């Protein structure tokens, strides 16, 4: 599966659970961690967990190894490492506080209209 297809899979999974303000950053040449960061948020701990759970389920169904999953129990900032795509699922309040989009402001955003199937 290509990185772009992996990103599309992640976008569709978080969208299925009504994640808000879904933003993808192209990290190629900027970070050694991943090619893409996908950032989104939920409005409650339950929604954050539902988004993370859906992504985990879809990844496992596709045979994609989840390299790391952190923060699920607290549901304030869940990080799901899919290898070349790292997904950050925030609680709304934490997203505003950490503001990863500003922190990685030199990373171009990916137009999601072309990614969502």
From Swiss-Prot:
Q: Spell out the Gene3D superfamilies in the cross-references.
A: Beta Polymerase, domain 2
Q: Which UniProt keywords apply?
A: Cytoplasm, Repressor, Translation regulation
Q: Where is the signal peptide?
A: none
List the GO biological process terms.
cytosolic ribosome assembly; negative regulation of ribosome biogenesis; negative regulation of translation
Subcellular location(s) of the protein? Cytoplasm
GO CC term (a single one): cytoplasm
Report the superkingdom from the record.
Bacteria
- One Pfam family hit: RsfS
**What does the record give under GO molecular function?**
ribosomal large subunit binding
Name the family the entry cites: Belongs to the Iojap/RsfS family.
* Subunit structure as annotated in this protein's UniProt entry: Interacts with ribosomal protein uL14 (rplN).
Xref: HAMAP family: Iojap_RsfS
Q: Tell me, what does this protein do in biology?
A: Functions as a ribosomal silencing factor. Interacts with ribosomal protein uL14 (rplN), blocking formation of intersubunit bridge B8. Prevents association of the 30S and 50S ribosomal subunits and the formation of functional ribosomes, thus repressing translation.
User: In its UniProt entry, what is this protein called?
Assistant: Ribosomal silencing factor RsfS
Q: Which gene encodes it?
A: rsfS
């Amino acid at each position: 599966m290509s990185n772009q297809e992996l990103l599309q899979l992640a976008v569709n999974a978080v969208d299925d659970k009504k994640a808000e303000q879904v933003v993808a950053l192209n990290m190629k040449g900027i970070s050694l961690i991943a090619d893409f960061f996908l950032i989104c948020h939920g409005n409650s701990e339950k929604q954050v967990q539902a988004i993370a759970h859906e992504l985990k389920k879809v990844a496992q169904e596709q045979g994609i190894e989840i390299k790391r999953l952190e923060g699920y129990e607290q549901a304030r900032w869940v990080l799901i490492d899919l290898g070349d795509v790292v997904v950050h699922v925030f609680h709304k309040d934490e997203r505003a506080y950490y503001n990863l989009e500003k922190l990685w402001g030199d990373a171009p955003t990916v137009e999601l209209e072309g990614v969502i199937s």
